[in-house]
Amino acid sequence: MFATKINAIMQHYETLAENDAYDWIRWKDGRTRFSKKVANRFFIGVMLDQGQKAERAWNAAEYLVDNYFNTSEDFWGDIATTHLARIKKICQTGYEGKSFALNYSFNKFPRNLKSSAKLMIEKYGSDPRNIWNVRAENVYQIYDRFLLFPGIGDALAKMAQFALVKNHGVAGGISSKSEMSIKPDILVRRVLRRVGLVSSGQTNVVVAQAREFGLSSPADFDAAVWVIGREYCFKSVPACNKCPIALACDSASV
């Protein structure tokens, strides 16, 4: 029964991968050569991609890096030497009068940003590229390193790893696809619980039980599940009648 459900999800991945609107779901050829500024945008995007739409988070990250903490060539050094009260004002009002972080991250982001600057300077030479500059056999280190930064939990660390390896060819790119595991964000957990692949939506349960799926490419499976969660499997009133895996779902009302 699990095989039927997993196959339905992977079939949806194949459908998505053929659609240019979902080009981010495909594995990219070659490796992206990040400038330091683009690397800073990526890291801030990871920090902000919680409690708000992904599109807003990544646009906000670009705006923050391009418009603040740029009095020197060292973005993280400028953050580290800026008083927390000033950082808080920028973070909560500096995005065209609005906050960069929303909801539960609104008050946490300023302090997390300053603490992250300290860690970035001490361990990675003020350069996020050093976080993911690893060989293919050490792809797991990307996840482990992101997880050490305040405000970046399991799901965000895994998302960062997926994006870097899949979309930017870091750590061997597609050759490392079997060495990763799914990211247990709220959308993925909801879909897996409802479809009947896990017994609970709790993060530790999802992570443990997903290891038993025998996935050849956890990142592809994860991407398809995430899209299903975002576009069909809503928290309230899910669109089961439109869901591409409804026939394989234990909870679908079609």
Model-derived features with residue positions:
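HhH-family (HhH-GPD) DNA N-glycosylase catalytic core used in base-excision repair
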Residues: 1-254
